[in-house]
Regions:
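Stable alpha-helical elements in mature extracytoplasmic
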Residues: 24, 29-33, 46, 63-70, ...
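Short, solvent-exposed alpha-helical surface patches in non-cytosolic proteins
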Residues: 29-34, 195-262
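Active-site-adjacent substructure of cysteine-protease-like catalytic cores
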Residues: 84-140
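Short, polar loop/linker segments at the starts of domains and inter-domain junctions
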Residues: 14-24, 119, 236-242
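Noncatalytic regulatory segments and standalone regulatory/sensor domains
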Residues: 2, 124-194
Length: 262
């Protein structure tokens, strides 16, 4: 099957800003969602348009995109539903059922990138996963031994790799996978008054970092100050498990000077 891939690495995007950087350098989040919507047959959205939505809804942060925030804003607009998981079996079942997924690649297993990167999985055949990569350049998947051995390039922006490799590449991100499907139209129901259910959905949509080294570098200074001050102690089992929202809040407080010792 042929796929249409939208690339953030078109030369024209070097001069178009996305927050404090350019679309070319930092719009893998919006671009991966554009590719997901196109693959599902829901919408043909340009990368700049999706970037504008990311900025307007607060998903754009220094150094990256908060995918949960972007999906929450985009879902009603483009008529899709989504959920999160870090389980390979759930990703595989979702793809085989006709859904697509955004994979959040990390920095510990540099399959899709040398640092954090979003890509879009569109198909599973057995345990072979077809992935669309918006950050494309010549020789990307022959540049390292890992990529040469574990990735097959089908066309520009279209690769296959194993389910196992997808798991390794996303192991230091929580959630690893954002599973996206066409929305099913249901009768309107009264607004939920079940705060427990609402809170569970909110928690499921949140991104968590298990260890300090998993936290994006632009948050690390502020989080380190909170740890040193004894304000963050983790889960007690060796994991920090800090949410992206808390990282953002601490970073804002640090820029205000609130975290500096008096």
């Amino acid at each position: 099957m042929a796929y249409t891939v939208k690339f953030q690495t078109e030369s024209k995007y070097k001069s178009i800003s996305y927050g404090s950087n350019s679309i070319y350098n930092s719009a893998c989040g919006p671009a991966s969602l554009c590719n997901a919507l196109k693959a599902l047959g829901l919408a043909d959205v340009s990368i700049p348009t999706m970037c504008q939505l990311a900025v307007s809804c607060g998903a754009r942060v220094d150094g990256g995109t908060v995918m949960a925030t972007l999906l929450k804003a985009a879902a009603p607009k483009y008529h899709f539903c989504y959920r999160t998981t870090s389980k390979n079996a759930e990703l595989l079942a979702h793809l085989k059922a006709g859904g697509v997924a955004i994979l959040h690649g990390g920095s510990s297993h540099k399959l899709f990138s040398n640092s954090g990167h979003f890509v879009c999985a569109v198909r599973a055949s057995g345990e072979t996963i077809t992935v669309l990569d918006s950050y494309w350049y010549a020789g990307k998947y022959t540049s390292t031994k890992l990529r040469r051995q574990k990735v097959k390039v089908l066309a520009k922006g279209v690769i296959t790799t194993s389910l196992y490799q997808c798991g390794l590449a996303t192991a230091d991100r929580a959630p690893s996978y954002y599973l996206i499907s066409k929305a099913i139209q249901k009768p309107q129901k009264p607004a939920s008054s079940n705060t427990t259910t609402d809170k569970k959905q909110e928690d499921d949509d949140m991104t968590y970092y298990k260890k300090f080294e998993n936290i994006p570098t632009w948050y690390q200074t502020a989080v380190k100050k909170a740890i040193d001050a004894g304000a963050l102690n983790g889960t007690g089992n060796g994991e920090l498990n800090v949410s992206e929202d808390l990282c953002r809040t601490l970073t804002v407080l640090d820029k205000m000077g609130t975290l500096d010792k008096k």
